[in-house]
Regions:
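Transmembrane-helix motifs of polytopic, lipid-linked glycan transferases
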Residues: 40, 107, 111-131, 169, ...
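Membrane-interface alpha helices of multi-pass inner-membrane proteins
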Residues: 140, 185-200, 211-212, 232-235
Length: 723
């Protein structure tokens, strides 16, 4: 073979290597240039303003478990807890250990999720181009990269958000057996299914297309693939099996009990369509850019489902079409309806038999059938789900609709090209329509990100959390508190928490330089010991009781209000407690000293509260995932039927610090003249079992025995006057 360069013919070994390399790179770029554009758009959408990512309870739990596993040498055996109170498998924790090993900052976990979702876009392009052509691959990958709902799940830490690349790889493995008829596909398919199940239990629905693949390609099955898959699945599930054995399979029993209840969830079809169209009800926030552009983008909600329907119909037509010749009619004329029905059934059975006979001989049709089964059967099973539907259940179906749209566009363009110039308008119109859809989706995603980064949303619209928090706002507030303490040489930062922030703030506060005390501010407030001087107090956005207690019982100077996206800001104070008005020698031995012999009355939000003042008589330093708890119960006028309890939780305690405990009084009742107070103490520690040399890690916690505290007079209660 001889190569021609610049008009000369020379042997290959004399061709300049640099010229060959340049030509090769030029050809490679010419054949794949679109993927660079797709990845550029995908990376912009997934990493622009990525620090505004959601950081609520689940996000903090997942990254904390990964971080603690790395830095404390623990073996994760569960992940976070599901909404039905079962423990998820720990596979995702092992993945998040990679960014956690590099930094304790959860931002790198968010970047890690974004990278995984970019890989999913790349795999979508490679898969679709391999089996359905370059145009189909380009359209499918571009639509998937710019779809709003999949993008949303690619911008925050959560175990289902790592599923997309593994879903595409799973379908890839099935196609290796069904379409290419290669052996050895079953092993990676089973392994990938196990990995997906570790990310979310709904992945078990992908077992249906796996069974269909086995039926369509029986000659490719090897027994050793099953053996290899069994061994590796046993290895990756062994940590979770340790947990299940120790709990006597309580999680599986919970799932079994739920199987008897359920209904048909037709709204699941709407969920599926929204994943495709990326357009739904505009946000209620009047400053939302998405809301402003909604009239210009609303057509996406019609066009995208129609394109997807075109993909389904096209794939279904190709799958069902088979060469057909009518059987010769029997001699004589059919008499009666019975004979006509029999003839129709005979013809139908003949069609089905010929279709099934010819199907295995056409791998292309087998692949399309597999795509349809992947999209239709799990969707129908989800509609019959026993415990309700949520958005992330549909991630196992992505990017299937976009692949089918790419197939539809490719076949439509090829058909119009093959039928002469009179159909050129259809081809060019298709190009224009797809280009407009992609541009509109890019605009829709970009303005949605701008809305999130600008706070043009309500932080209350994120059930099941009381309110939503983002990583940037939380880190900024903690950094401001830390910086203030260092600038003023204050030796402690007190931080209020509630159900929405306690997990996230407890983890993030560990990166602060100044010692911290975090406490649940639902009914309690911790103030510094007046003898040690003032301290910094960071108050949450909805801690109205804390602000009311500060006004009445402390000297608080508001320094700053660190902004929060989508809701009211934090409040940053420098505080010192006021002097007690009625000194008391009562208290609970070696635990709490009563500072004021009177319980003071407080009105807040049309409700009445009684407030008692105490000081800690001992200290406890922060410990690994440990909290210290006092449960105080009051009996107004000694009446146990009107009892009220307040639970105070702290990450640390310092001797001499002041504790304010508030008790809400019955609505419409009168203020009591006296209250009797009883107190119990317990510690919450992580439930990390030990199996010989293995120190396991779970998300669960254990409470030590509740100890009833003894008062200084030997009784188990203290009675104080209320005013």
């Amino acid at each position: 073979m001889r190569t021609k360069l610049r008009g000369h013919t020379c042997p290959p070994d004399r061709v300049p290597q640099g010229s060959l390399r340049i030509r090769f790179l030029h050809l490679a770029f010419a054949n794949t240039w679109e993927i660079y554009l797709i990845l550029l758009v995908a990376s912009f959408l997934r990493f622009y303003q990525v620090d505004t990512s959601e950081f609520d309870d689940d996000q903090a739990i997942l990254f904390r478990l990964a971080h603690d596993a790395v830095y404390h040498g623990l073996l994760p055996i569960t992940s976070n807890t599901a909404s039905i109170s079962i423990a998820h498998p720990p596979g995702v924790i092992y993945l998040f250990m990679l960014p956690a090993a590099l930094s304790a900052n959860p931002l790198w976990g968010v970047v890690f999720v974004g990278i995984f979702n970019m890989i999913a876009v790349l795999l979508t392009y490679l898969f679709t181009r391999r089996y359905y052509g370059r145009l189909a691959g380009t359209v499918g990958a571009f639509l998937y990269a710019t779809a709003l709902k999949p993008l949303t799940y690619g911008r925050f830490i959560w175990q289902p958000n790592l599923m997309p690349p593994f879903v595409v790889l799973f379908v890839f493995a099935l196609f290796l057996g069904v379409v290419e008829r290669r052996k050895g596909w079953l092993f990676p398919a089973l392994l990938l299914l196990g990995i997906l199940y570790q990310m979310h239990e709904t992945a078990i629905l992908l077992f249906v297309p796996l069974l269909v693949a086995v039926v369509l390609a029986p000659g490719t099955i090897r027994w050793r693939d099953l053996a290899f898959a069994f061994v590796l699945l046993l290895i990756i599930f062994s940590p979770y099996l340790l947990w299940e054995f120790s709990t006597k399979f309580a999680d599986l029993l919970t799932l079994y009990r739920l199987e008897g209840h359920g209904r048909l969830y037709l709204e699941g079809i709407g969920y599926y369509l929204f994943f495709i169209s990326s357009f739904g009800t505009p946000p209620a926030n009047m400053h939302s850019v998405v809301r402003m552009l909604a009239p210009l983008l609303s057509w996406l909600g019609v066009v995208m489902p129609l394109l997807a329907a075109g993909g389904f119909v096209t794939a279904g037509w190709v799958v069902m079409w088979t060469p057909y010749q009518a059987a010769p009619a029997p001699p004589g004329r059919l008499q009666g309806i019975a004979l006509r029905i029999a003839s129709t059934l005979r013809l139908g059975w003949g069609f089905v038999r010929r279709w099934w006979t010819t199907l295995p001989a056409t791998p292309y049709r087998c692949g399309l059938l597999l795509l349809l089964v992947w999209q239709i059967v799990p969707l129908l099973l989800l509609l019959l789900h026993k415990i309700g539907l949520t958005w992330h259940y549909f991630l196992i179906l992505m990017p299937g609709p976009f692949i089918l749209i790419g197939l539809f566009v490719s076949i439509l363009v090829r058909w119009s090209r093959n039928h002469g110039q009179k159909w050129n308008i259809l081809r060019y119109g298709t190009y224009v329509l797809i280009s407009l859809v992609i541009i509109a989706q890019i605009v829709n995603c970009t303005v949605a990100i701008v809305d999130t980064a600008s706070g043009n949303f309500s932080d209350r619209d994120f059930p099941p959390y009381p309110y939503h928090n983002d990583l940037r706002s939380l880190q900024h507030a903690l950094n401001e508190a830390d910086k203030l303490a260092q600038q003023r040489h204050l030796n402690r930062v007190y931080i209020t928490t509630d159900a929405a922030t306690q997990t996230a703030l407890r983890y993030l506060a560990e990166q602060m330089q100044t010692p911290t005390t975090l406490f649940d501010a639902t009914k309690c407030l911790v103030l510094p010991n007046s003898a040690t001087g003032p301290a910094v107090l960071l108050v949450g956005p909805y801690d109205g009781l804390t602000n009311a207690l500060l006004r009445q019982f402390a000297s608080a100077t508001l320094i700053d209000q660190p902004a929060r996206l989508g809701g009211p800001p934090f409040r940053l104070y420098v505080v010192t407690p006021n002097a007690g008005q009625g000194a008391s020698h009562d208290g609970f031995v070696q635990n709490l000293q009563l500072l004021d012999g009177r319980a003071q009355h407080l009105n807040l939000y049309n409700s009445s509260w009684l407030v008692t003042r105490w000081s800690f008589m001992w200290s406890e330093q922060p410990r690994f995932r440990t909290t210290y708890n006092y449960a105080l119960t009051v009996l107004p006028n000694g009446d146990s039927e009107q009892s009220r309890q307040s639970l105070c939780t702290f990450t640390s305690m310092r001797e001499g610090d002041e504790l304010l405990v508030a008790f809400d009084l019955p609505v419409g009742g009168s203020v009591p003249t006296s209250v009797t107070i009883r107190t119990q103490y317990f510690v919450t520690v992580p439930n990390d079992p030990v199996y010989g040399p293995l120190h396991a890690e779970t998300n669960n916690s254990l409470n030590t025995a509740w100890v009833t505290l003894q008062a200084t007079d030997g009784e188990d209660s203290i009675t104080v006057v209320a005013k």
